[in-house]
Curated annotation (Swiss-Prot):
SUPFAM superfamilies: EF-G C-terminal domain-like, P-loop containing nucleoside triphosphate hydrolases, Translation proteins. The lineage of its organism: Bacteria, Pseudomonadati, Pseudomonadota, Gammaproteobacteria, Oceanospirillales. Its EC number is 3.6.5.n1. It catalyses: GTP + H2O = GDP + phosphate + H(+). Keywords: Cell inner membrane, Cell membrane, GTP-binding, Hydrolase, Membrane, Nucleotide-binding, Protein biosynthesis. This is Elongation factor 4. Required for accurate and efficient protein synthesis under certain stress conditions. May act as a fidelity factor of the translation reaction, by catalyzing a one-codon backward translocation of tRNAs on improperly translocated ribosomes. Back-translocation proceeds from a post-translocation (POST) complex to a pre-translocation (PRE) complex, thus giving elongation factor G a second chance to translocate the tRNAs correctly. Binds to ribosomes in a GTP-dependent manner. Residues 11-193 form the tr-type G domain. GO terms for biological process: positive regulation of translation. The gene is lepA. Belongs to the TRAFAC class translation factor GTPase superfamily. Classic translation factor GTPase family. LepA subfamily.
Length: 606
């Protein structure tokens, strides 16, 4: 049976994705589905097939959306084409999820039958329901002794509000219940709507850059067909290209020569310009595509956290820029602009979704593009109301205008929803209070409690997620959205080394935290700056006021060692000479600040 006949019917296509929290077994479940449908041979089936980046494997998290097309022979004798789009589960990557969901008609909500529901799955599940997807609850890890499916099914109903009485109970690890799950999938997820005869309309779900092929785009066709050799046009750039390769992922790339309405696959059109196929764009045919509407893609995500990134050697600047461009293609939420710093030279101010995203981007740049990078402390965007009535936005502390010209500073506030087991509620509440949070709501849901807080974003992005995990033994989960800008008493904390301001070490902090923060910072820097031949003074200042100071003592050579007894004036002469030399050195001497010192600012836990 040729592929053409087999895929002639829309009713036999099922597009779905998996929603799950970190560690609830999403990647194992997808491995198992691929194995059952024979997408890979036993030999090729390594753990977490879809996590293709080394980094994803090491950290055990999914970062990028991936897709697989599988053929499943159901009990009714029909062969169904399952298009499965993998989604990440970490809070920093929620935009990836909304993108993947847009291309599907159904979603499997995977919940760990031992742990219960987590905040991130709740957020993603709401997104799925809003987009009109059919959500099937799946209780995973049924082979574990601590699995308690009835309690968890009850939690799913209470917290998310979807019927979980007949949820699929599976163990992806042992393969228990997997066949039944696929049958449910085929039965309950609606087939895609679309007309293969209509003009082409396709959505770019993801793009990445290949050095040989140019831009490869993962697309979902809503109407029409796309064949090798077709002339296509991107709606946003209005540029036309000729299709070089069309096909599906099985997870490997496999050319098929044609994609029809309702299918998910890849398109390569020899686009060498990185901005040629932006994610979320609509593809139409070059001829007659003018009347086709643009698909309501997904809103461009605004970065929440900014940090300066600088190549360690200034010769790498061009390579760094190329690397950022290629990465930004694959990661629609990266935002960057050139920046230069007195201490670190030329680099970029890069915007991220959160600190995990920042670490991952830095690691990908260093691994995939062999760059050595310095990263400054992450900051959020502040809104400044100036005295002349204009409003400015600042994400870089060293670019803050003079305090005398600022009427008021406003910091971004987020609304955070935290799900936590009852035993740890006290810890979480006191952590939120410490971070200047205001409690809005507290709901008891089965054995878990949902806390709703308003917190300053600067407190959340630094290390809140890690702290939350550690005070709740890993059970608490967090999901947050930007609410508004709110006036706050904010000040800029500068670090002076030997009287020179180091712009890369400046941070914006709340006035109440300025003294302890300044002290901690100075102490930390003292440990990290190597001793010089002269005293190095480290000061933390607010405006003109020094709030903390410490000195790295000079190394000293014993110049009087060669005098055996004798006249004291001779010794004094040598000591005076040494003193004068040190003084001269201090005026011209430059203090090298090691990379660790910049990182110390990132890891400052009050």
């Amino acid at each position: 049976m040729s592929r053409d006949e087999k895929n002639a019917t829309l009713p036999h296509i099922r597009n779905f994705s998996i929603i799950a929290h970190i560690d609830h077994g999403k990647s194992t479940l997808s491995d198992r589905i691929i194995q059952i449908c024979g997408g890979l041979t036993e030999r090729e089936l390594k753990e977490q097939v879809l996590d293709s980046m080394d980094l994803e494997r090491e950290r055990g998290i999914t970062i990028k959306a991936q897709s697989v097309t599988l053929d499943y022979k159901a009990e009714d004798g029909q062969v169904y084409q399952l298009n499965f789009i993998d989604t990440p589960g970490h809070v920093d990557f929620s935009y990836e999820v909304s993108r993947s969901l847009y291309a599907c008609e159904g979603a499997l909500l995977v919940v760990d039958a031992g742990q219960g529901v987590e905040a991130q799955s709740v957020a993603n599940c709401y997104t799925a329901v809003e987009q009109g997807l059919e959500v099937l609850p799946v209780l995973n890890k049924m082979d574990l002794p601590q699995a308690d499916p009835d309690r968890v099914a009850h939690e799913v109903e209470e917290i998310i509000g979807i019927d979980a009485s007949d949820a699929c109970r599976v163990s992806a690890k042992s393969g228990l219940g997997m066949e039944a799950l696929l049958e449910r999938l085929v039965r309950d997820v609606p087939p895609p709507k679309g007309d293969p005869e209509a003009p082409l309309q396709a959505l770019i779900v993801d793009s990445w850059f290949d050095n040989y092929l140019g831009v490869i785009s993962l697309v979902r066709l809503f109407d029409g067909t796309i064949k090798k050799g077709d002339k296509i046009r991107m709606k946003s750039t209005e540029r036309a290209w000729e299709v070089g390769e069309v096909g599906i992922f099985t997870p490997k790339r496999k050319e098929t020569g044609i994609l029809r309405a309702g299918e998910v696959g890849f398109v390569v059109a020899g686009i060498k310009d990185i901005h040629g196929a932006p994610v979320g764009d609509t593809i139409v045919h070059a001829k007659g595509g003018e009347d086709v509407a643009r698909l309501p893609g997904f809103q461009k995500v605004k970065p929440q956290v900014y940090a300066g990134m600088f190549p360690v050697s200034s010769d790498d600047y061009e390579d760094f820029r190329d690397a950022l461009e290629k990465l930004a293609l694959n990661d629609a939420s990266l935002d960057y602009e050139p920046e230069n710093s007195d201490a670190l030279g030329f680099g970029f101010r890069v915007g991220f979704l959160g600190t995990l995203h920042m670490e991952i981007v830095q690691e990908r740049l260093e691994r995939e593009y062999n760059l050595d990078l310095l990263t400054t402390a992450p900051t959020v965007i502040y809104e400044l109301a100036m005295k002349d009535g204009e409003t400015r936005y600042v994400s870089n502390p060293s670019k803050l205008p003079d305090m005398a010209d600022i009427e008021e500073m406003r910091e971004p506030v987020v609304r955070a929803s935290i799900l936590v087991p009852q035993d740890f509620v006290g810890n979480v509440i006191s952590e939120c209070e410490q971070r200047r949070g205001t409690q809005l709501d507290m709901l008891f849901l089965g054995s878990q409690i949902q806390l709703t807080y308003e917190l300053p974003m600067s407190e959340v992005v630094m290390d809140f997620f890690d702290r939350l995990k550690s005070i709740s033994r890993g059970y608490a989960s967090l999901e947050y959205n930007f609410e508004r800008f709110e006036a706050a008493k904010l000040v800029r904390l500068d670090v002076l080394i030997n009287g020179d301001r180091v712009d890369a070490l400046a941070t914006i902090v709340h006035r109440d935290h300025a003294h302890p923060r300044g002290r901690a910072l100075v102490e930390k820097m003292k440990e990290l700056i190597p001793r010089q031949m002269f005293d190095v003074a480290i000061q933390a200042t607010l405006g003109g006021q020094v709030v903390a100071r410490s000195t790295v003592k000079a190394l000293r050579k014993n110049v009087t060692a060669k005098c055996y007894g004798g006249d004291v004036t001779r010794k004094r002469k040598l000591l005076e000479k040494q003193k004068a030399g040190k003084k001269r050195m201090k005026q011209v001497g430059k203090v090298e600040i090691p990379q660790d010192a910049f990182l110390a600012v990132l890891k400052m836990n009050d």
